[in-house]
């Protein structure tokens, strides 16, 4: 069985915020490429992993109905907070860098 994976408007805004932060820190064209690759990795990993095995990842501490997907990238990575809405749909609610303390 395959799940449809959607990103909420908040998750989309989080990706934009993370991308903007990386752009602000960029010194070289390689840094710009890395920023784009990071966002693409988050999108691709969430789509692939959550479409197939959304029940496999840890439950979120603040809400047991939600789960968190760890997305490695470079030396750290990202965390996607998501909820399984139905037997066929998963919604990514928020995304943060692993070094951030909370989602918002």
Predicted ranges, named:
Residues 1-67:
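Basic, Lys/Arg-enriched alpha-helical interface segments
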Residues 70-104:
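Enriched for short, Lys/Arg-rich terminal
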């Amino acid at each position: 069985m395959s799940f449809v994976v959607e990103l909420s408007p908040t998750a989309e805004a989080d990706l934009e915020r993370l991308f903007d932060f990386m752009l602000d820190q960029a010194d070289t064209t390689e840094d710009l490429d890395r920023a784009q690759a990071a966002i693409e990795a988050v999108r691709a990993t969430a789509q692939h992993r959550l479409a197939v095995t959304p029940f496999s990842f840890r439950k979120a501490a603040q809400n047991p109905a939600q789960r968190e997907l760890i997305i490695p990238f470079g030396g750290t990575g990202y965390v996607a907070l998501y909820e399984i809405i139905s037997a066929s749909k998963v919604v990514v609610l928020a995304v943060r860098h692993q070094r951030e303390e909370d989602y918002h």
